[in-house]
Amino acid sequence: MVTATHPHSLGKLSRIRHLARQYAALTKPRVTQLAVFCAIIGMFLATPGMVPWRVLIGGAAGIWLLAGAAFAINCLVEQKIDALMRRTAWRPSATGEITTPQTLVFSAILGGAGMWLLHVYANDLTMWLTFATFLGYAVVYTILLKPATPQNIVIGGLSGAMPPALGWAAVAGEVPAEAWFLVLIIFTWTPPHFWALALYRRADYAKSGLPMLPVTHGERYTLLHILLYTLIMIAATLLPFVYGMSGYIYLAAALALGAGFLAYAWKMYRNYSDELAQRAFRFSILYLSLLFAALLVDHYFKFVPQV
């Protein structure tokens, strides 16, 4: 026997799904996924064995929720700016579909739940470090730095670079030098990654009034800085090998991926096009994902030739 579903019920279910997608959009899911992925890699690198399941799941979920809370505040603060930019005008905070009070409550729920998960399933060090990262992104970067200086992404990049240290702390209860190497890699990766986006979206940023480097200093200056920061980033990626934290599997991956990144930076510097900048931006995301995956593979299958 087939039971008919009332049209009103279908409409209500559809609205709930739509609203859930809108709230999820406030957390910038793709950015959050990459951050949590790096945090999980940090967890595995902190131990020679397997990460305890409660720490892996509870810790990752807590970091995910606090990251989402920070991004929701970012969307709230920048709702008027987002409405001016084609890339972000669709966001529910920019369209007004989700109101300011609703966004604040949503962020508070995510943040509170994330803090609780980290307290219960990880440790207080991770909880407070993640909360500090939340403040660093939502307040220091979004409110203070981003509208004030073209070096916003450099100075404020530390909060976005913290996930590996958060993951490491969740397992080990400390943040040793090895964890800070991972933070440094993401910290130096962030400017060339973001400036590639800002270059091919510079008309949007000019309209928004935000002092992004391509808008304030021009294309050529930005391209030079992308090239320089790419070289600094490649040097930073060698630290895990130099320190003895990683072996030749990671070194080979770091050099190969770094060569690819440098090729994009050099091509843009020599013969810029928006299409090339867009490809470089996409590659930068793949680059970081593969680099951290190589760290994980090397951690469990380290190859160091005998002398």
From Swiss-Prot:
Domain of life assignment: Bacteria
Enzyme class: transferase
Bilayer disposition of the protein: Multi-pass membrane protein
Primary subcellular site in the record, as a coarse category: membrane
Any GO CC annotation of this UniProt entry: plasma membrane
Function text: Converts heme B (protoheme IX) to heme O by substitution of the vinyl group on carbon 2 of heme B porphyrin ring with a hydroxyethyl farnesyl side group.
Name listed for the protein in its UniProt record: Protoheme IX farnesyltransferase
Organism in which the protein naturally occurs: Cupriavidus necator (strain ATCC 17699 / DSM 428 / KCTC 22496 / NCIMB 10442 / H16 / Stanier 337) (Ralstonia eutropha)
